[in-house]
Regions:
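Conserved catalytic-core segment of nucleotide-activated headgroup transferases in glycan assembly
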Residues: 1-39, 199
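Short, polar loop motifs at secondary-structure junctions
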Residues: 33-35, 62, 80, 220-225
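Nucleotide-activated donor-binding/catalytic signature segment of Leloir-type glycosyltransferases, i.e.
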Residues: 40-61
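Acidic donor-binding loop of glycosyltransferase active sites
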Residues: 67-83, 89-93, 98
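C-terminal alpha-helical cap of glycosyltransferases
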Residues: 132-140, 162-181
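A short, well-ordered alpha-helix in the C-terminal region of glycosyltransferases
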Residues: 136, 143-159
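Active-site anion-handling motifs in enzyme catalytic cores
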Residues: 179-233
Length: 233
């Protein structure tokens, strides 16, 4: 709950009195700690006092986020936190200090991907936008609410799963290995030091096991001799 990340929490708290009028048994859970926690808590306490009950609960820092997300119906947040909520099958309102995307569905996919779900370059968030989309969500029938959660989860499984990330990484490595780029080796070479010469030979042998005819360049005090003996540049 650092000041650089607490804007939306404050805006949501500001909107709670109006949302509470329309949503029965409203409960808002704010998770996190940081240098702005006390200010956020002061706002929450003031709203709770005004409403006469603890609508807003601040948990402080937590590591068991899954247990807090599981019972919720709607998540408000940004970036990785929003993706984690989507992975848990929860509808999300994507909003952060950098901007506002809103209640996430297929129509918001392009801007979500373009901004890495961080909202940079989007319209700025404010309490009215948050209130509008929270009420919009709770006015949907249960089937539509469920569909929003399912859409987010399927997106995570398809585009942001561990398997997908690993596959993408492997593709990058495969692409790099196909390029005939020079492999530069720098060390204490060309000085007839048996230890360093043995190390260089071992490195070259290992590289040749992984790639046939690697394009190796060695920085050496005696380039001609090193090139002739090790068959490198």
């Amino acid at each position: 709950m650092d000041e650089s990340r607490s804007l939306v929490a404050k805006q949501l708290i500001e909107a709670v009195p109006e949302i509470d009028k329309a949503v029965n048994n409203l409960k808002v859970i704010v998770v996190g700690a940081g240098d702005d926690y006390d200010n956020v808590k002061t706002m929450a306490d003031s709203v709770n006092q005004k409403l006469g009950r603890d609508v807003i609960v601040l948990t402080g820092a937590r590591t068991d986020i899954n247990k807090l997300i599981a019972p919720c119906k709607l998540f408000v947040g940004v970036s990785r936190a929003a993706l984690e909520a989507m992975a848990a099958d929860k509808p999300v309102i994507i909003a952060g200090n950098e901007g506002y995307i809103g209640l996430f569905d297929e129509s918001k996919l392009a801007v979500g991907i373009d901004t890495n779900f961080c909202c940079r370059g989007c319209e700025m968030s404010n309490s009215e936008l948050i209130k509008r989309d929270v009420l919009k969500f709770f006015n949907l029938d249960e089937n539509k609410q469920k569909e929003l959660g399912e859409y987010g989860r399927e997106l995570i499984k398809k585009e942001y799963s561990v398997t997908r990330m690993a596959d993408d990484s492997i593709k990058v490595y495969d692409w790099a290995l196909q390029k005939n780029k020079e492999i530069l080796i720098s060390g204490y070479y060309g000085f007839k030091n048996s230890g360093d010469d043995a190390l260089l030979q071992a490195i070259i042998n290992d590289l040749k096991q992984y790639k046939e005819s690697p394009n190796i360049v060695v920085l050496s005090a005696n380039p001609a001799e090193t090139m002739e003996y090790y068959k490198v540049k």
